[in-house]
């Protein structure tokens, strides 16, 4: 069905509708500076990501389209690229890098398993994500540049990783009622 995105202004205690198009808009992701919202739309039955000013001014801008599904998942802290989810091809779901300047899509995490919930480190050097490659959801961390080593950081399951603002800790849920934290060595 049709869904739209709304922005709630805490200081004014008021909600403003941001999208008005036919079809559904979902998967909203804030830019790091808060000026934009990126979101997926199914209005044309393809994979399309739009960018819209978070204050509602201007028209939505189509920034990426693919024949298979894509959706935004996280914005880099320098606002130069997005981590996006994708389906299709030879794997289940993957995490891709979408460069906002060149509009190029390149693989970040590509496995034959479900990979989701990416969290980009505050220095934009690492990505944490959940994957079911071990047979259950676990948290992995991978370098973003050059050599792409991958490390499993959970051992009792894990989902929804998030970095502490200074990048020195990674948080994730084992179950909805159990939050875990893993220390991260700066510069590692």
Please tell me what each predicted stretch does.
Residues 2-6, 45-51, 90-96, 135-140, ...:
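Structural motif
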Residues 6, 56, 122-125:
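Alpha-helical solenoid scaffolds in eukaryotic macromolecular assemblies
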Residues 9-13, 53-57, 99-103, 143-147, ...:
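Short loop/turn segments that connect beta-strands within beta-propeller blades
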Residues 20-42, 61, 66-85, 110-130, ...:
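Conserved beta-propeller blade repeats
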Residues 81-83, 93-100:
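Acidic, glycine-rich loop-and-beta core segments that form the ion-binding/anion-interacting portion
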Residues 98-101, 124-126:
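Long hydrophobic segments that form regular secondary structure
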Residues 166-188:
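C-terminal structured "cap/appendage" subdomains that terminate the fold
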């Amino acid at each position: 069905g049709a869904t739209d995105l709304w922005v709630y202004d805490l200081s004014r205690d008021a909600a403003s509708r941001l999208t008005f198009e036919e079809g559904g808009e979902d998967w909203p992701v804030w830019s790091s500076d808060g000026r934009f919202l990126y979101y997926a739309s199914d209005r044309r039955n393809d994979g399309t990501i739009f960018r819209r000013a978070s204050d509602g001014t201007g028209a939505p801008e189509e920034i990426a389209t693919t024949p298979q599904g894509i959706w935004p998942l996280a914005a880099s802290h320098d606002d130069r690229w997005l981590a996006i989810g994708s389906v299709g091809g030879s794997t289940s779901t993957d995490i891709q890098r979408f460069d906002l300047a060149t509009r190029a899509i390149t693989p970040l995490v590509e496995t034959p398993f479900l990979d989701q919930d990416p969290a980009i480190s505050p220095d934009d050097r690492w990505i944490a994500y959940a994957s079911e490659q071990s047979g259950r959801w676990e948290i992995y961390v991978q370098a973003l540049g050059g050599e792409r080593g991958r490390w499993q950081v959970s051992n009792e399951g894990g989902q929804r990783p998030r970095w502490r603002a200074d990048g020195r800790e990674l948080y994730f849920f084992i179950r909805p009622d159990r939050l875990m934290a893993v220390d991260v060595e700066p510069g590692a």
